[in-house]
């Protein structure tokens, strides 16, 4: 039985709900869901270009956990780009974690 997920600090939510290949209806394509913590890890590491330790501290997780999250996120994005799948993103109705 896996351990319960610890709360993570999420700095922002996306402005879009999904990305998909152009010209193909979304209902005809397989979907991969990007979790809120995975999107935040991508934002911190790739957009803000923070080191893993800084990004992990910002999210309230260990550096090892951050490394696992960013690896999972990059894998999902790469699969969607290479295999032409729909990438669904967390939406505004999900709870946004507040900084303590």
UniProtKB/Swiss-Prot annotation:
Membrane-spanning residues: none
Signal sequence residues: none
Family annotation (InterPro entries): UPF0251, WH-like_DNA-bd_sf
Pfam families xrefs: DUF134
PANTHER family membership: PTHR37478, UPF0251 PROTEIN TK0562
Family from the record: Belongs to the UPF0251 family.
Protein name per the record: UPF0251 protein VV2_0946
Annotated organism of origin: Vibrio vulnificus (strain CMCP6)
């Amino acid at each position: 039985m896996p351990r319960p997920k610890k709360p993570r600090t999420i700095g922002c939510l996306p402005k879009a709900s999904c990305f998909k290949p152009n010209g193909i209806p979304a209902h005809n394509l397989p979907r991969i869901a990007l979790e809120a913590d995975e999107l935040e890890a991508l934002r911190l590491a790739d957009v803000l270009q923070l080191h893993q330790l800084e990004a992990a501290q910002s999210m309230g997780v260990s550096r090892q956990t951050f490394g696992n999250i960013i690896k999972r996120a990059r894998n999902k994005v790469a699969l969607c780009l290479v295999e032409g799948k729909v990438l669904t993103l967390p939406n505004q109705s999900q709870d946004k974690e507040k900084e303590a």
